[in-house]
């Protein structure tokens, strides 16, 4: 039907309904803009935070050049290694009066030890006397340790004098009465073309003619021992000092952190704790096998420090860090990841890293053939921490420590 002439048909418009969607385009625009601002701000903050890390990772040089090495899977802590709390039965002695009594020697009831502030002290009853100092003050800090000196291994010789291994200054003989100090081997002297960098422990033959000692590294000093462990540098040596000719000879080299040393009963060989490798080697220093080396015990449940004779004819081995199984061992995990070691040492100091090492203390008694006899534990290091040596005397075990501010005494009849 045609529209009437002169009239126009108008289509009705739908009423305009106002809703919340009316301003949606404007809201979306605002939201998009705010999101962009947020993302840009977030990315800027992330970049700002990551930039120093990237500089550390790609620009800064790591202080260590780690070597790849492998450790066997740690032994299960069962049987002889079964965890217990026996070290918690120990008594702390001279708390806050002795810092870092690493090694111990005794003449009768009188004990001698070296401390973190460079002193060699004499312990009589409840009294501590400073017997001698080898280095020069100031002492007591990492910065001055290399000039102050750090007495580590200590032994009583057949003539009643003390033989002392100072990490920075060398080998010394000390009169236990007068405190007179005599230098035997200086670290200034080159041995087979290399200086002594980290003199650690020693032992003396029964006739006093030979002193065997360990030089843990020619690259790293004692104050950087974590660098040595992490780098796994194989530059440690076992040396022999002849008290008559004054000559020093290399008995064995290319060891990874040779630490504690103990003469075998026949004195034709010495046991050497190879700390980084969690084992004890036997180095032949005289006789038909001189110059040879074999393994006394492999794959220990911890990292061995000093070795000392036990009254049963075996050996006490102190370990300040363990390789728990079941459990997690940081050093085992990192052994085949040198890139991660480098990164860690770019980011953290040695003191910071030590905080991540469990305070688990462990002392193991081994038979003369290396078989485990028994073990004493303090899993959290609540009483005995950072154990470096177990020294047996008169039915008691005296526990030295490279770091703790005390000495521990354990009654063996009660454990």
Curated annotation (Swiss-Prot):
Pfam families: SSL_N, Str_synth. Its main location: membrane. One of its GO terms (cellular component) is membrane. InterPro entries: 6-blade_b-propeller_TolB-like, Strictosidine_synth_cons-reg. It comes from the Eukaryota. Keywords: Glycoprotein, Membrane, Signal-anchor, Transmembrane, Transmembrane helix. The keyword Hydrolase does not apply. Residues 61-412 are extracellular. Belongs to the strictosidine synthase family. Glycans are attached at residue 159. It is found in: Membrane. The keyword Glycoprotein applies. This is Adipocyte plasma membrane-associated protein. Coiled coil: none annotated. The chain crosses the membrane at residues 40-60. Residues 1-39 are cytoplasmic. One of its GO terms (molecular function) is arylesterase activity. It is a single-pass type II membrane protein.
